């Protein structure tokens, strides 16, 4: 998704300048794929003919939890359904199966590539994945299953915000932001708010054409309100040159939030671009 968003400002002309005759599918993984980049890749680059194989797995999974089955058809940004051998489910806070709403992505049975533990840290392994529900692996992602059985991801469950009593994942807010042509990437975090409990703060990376445009932040805030409602108007929108990412291009929201609040960002061993931290700063 990060690569798609970075190419999107170049428009369809970029694809027209390349020989794509041997291309049979696009692959996407690492983080939720927002609707606007999905449609750009499918319609403008693939000309509506090349499927987007959106998958979700993890280093600790050593496999694919959710993946597209091209015989099943596609819905924009969907991940199809559980891959072979993966007893995936979406559950509520009590561990009950949930459909049509956002819940925790879990696995109810072992799988061939299952991680057995963390090196010399067995207690941390159990606390990370097995403490919530007995005999159930909690992956740490928000997911949902729609009325047609298609699965969707909504970001990390530990990144969830509670804004005026409404739970929202960063993916919803970020999708609204990157729906603007001026925005290449976004990271949404929640910060303490005396009225709402939490308020969203959004960091955005502008497109090359919008770099230096002082009105980008206002347009991002207005677009989030238009898409999600007035309750989700950001307390602040910060324009930055880059966002901290792991080597697999995942945005490190916990680091963004820690820096914004003046807290210790913790372990940075997986940070790929340390120079990005300079632009975050404290709120």
Model-derived features: positions:
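AMP-binding/adenylate-forming
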Residues: 1-13, 21-27, 53
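Residue-level signal for well-ordered alpha-helical positions
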Residues: 9-10, 121, 164
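Short, hinge-like loop/turn segments at secondary-structure boundaries
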Residues: 14-17, 68-73, 204-205
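Glycine-centered tight turns that cap/initiate beta-strands
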Residues: 22, 124, 182-185, 236, ...
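Conserved AMP-binding/adenylate-forming
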Residues: 24-26, 32-150, 157-160, 173
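Hydrophobic/anchoring residues in structured secondary elements
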Residues: 25-28, 188, 238-239, 273
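Generic structural signal for residues in well-ordered beta-strands
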Residues: 52, 88, 186-188, 234-239
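AMP-binding/adenylate-forming catalytic core of the ANL superfamily
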Residues: 111, 116-117, 127, 135, ...
């Amino acid at each position: 998704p990060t690569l798609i968003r970075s190419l999107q400002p170049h428009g369809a002309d970029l694809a027209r300048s390349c020989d794509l005759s041997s291309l049979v599918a696009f692959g996407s993984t690492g983080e939720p794929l927002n609707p606007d980049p999905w449609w750009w890749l499918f319609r403008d680059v693939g000309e509506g003919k090349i499927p987007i194989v959106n998958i979700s797995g993890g280093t600790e999974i050593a496999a694919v939890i959710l993946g597209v089955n091209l015989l099943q058809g596609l819905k924009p940004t969907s991940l199809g359904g559980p891959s072979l051998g993966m007893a995936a489910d979406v559950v509520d806070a009590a561990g009950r199966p949930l459909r049509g709403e956002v819940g925790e992505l879990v696995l109810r049975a072992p799988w061939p590539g299952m991680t057995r533990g963390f090196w010399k840290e067995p207690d941390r392994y159990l606390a990370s994945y097995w403490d919530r529900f007995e005999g159930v692996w909690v992956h740490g992602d928000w997911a949902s299953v729609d009325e047609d059985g298609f699965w969707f991801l909504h970001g990390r469950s530990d990144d969830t915000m509670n804004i005026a009593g409404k739970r929202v994942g960063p993916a919803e807010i970020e999708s609204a932001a990157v729906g603007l042509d001026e925005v290449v990437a976004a990271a949404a975090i929640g910060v303490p708010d005396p009225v709402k409990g939490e308020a969203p703060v959004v960091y955005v990376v502008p497109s090359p054409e919008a770099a230096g445009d002082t009105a980008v932040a206002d347009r991002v805030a207005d677009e989030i309100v238009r898409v999600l409602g007035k309750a989700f108007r950001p307390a602040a929108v910060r324009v930055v040159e880059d966002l901290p990412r792991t080597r697999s291009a995942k945005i490190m929201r916990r680091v963004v939030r820690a820096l914004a609040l003046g807290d210790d960002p913790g372990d940075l061993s997986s940070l790929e671009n340390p120079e990005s931290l300079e632009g975050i700063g404290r709120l």
